[in-house]
């Protein structure tokens, strides 16, 4: 699986073929179905980033829908810096219980700990009135904002982007 640019990924117009488009861009053989709610939430997330004038280059090197089949685990968005942190962003199409968000991010940190890097975890929740953002610091869940995500993903440095398995 290869990393992609989020803007390019979200240019898929036909939601029914989004999964095939994603698999082609990422060179993924997984062929996992992508729900329409997931696509809409991803596009909402991207729209918020673009509204804050993010440079297109900072949308590069995202790993979308990475999964570990042996444990049935999927990560919505990862960005893995070679000499920096692992950024984990989970996307939710609606608000769920905060304890469930915290549990998921805690589990994700455990699975990502094999990278031996700092792990920065967020959950982006699309709501009827906009969005909510949460961060997990390894101890507790905190309400956050899109600016903190921007700060984390707009770092200079090389990222892993090829043959991520």
For the regions a language model picked out, list residue spans one by one.
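Accessory nucleic-acid engagement/destabilization modules that flank
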Residues: 1-164
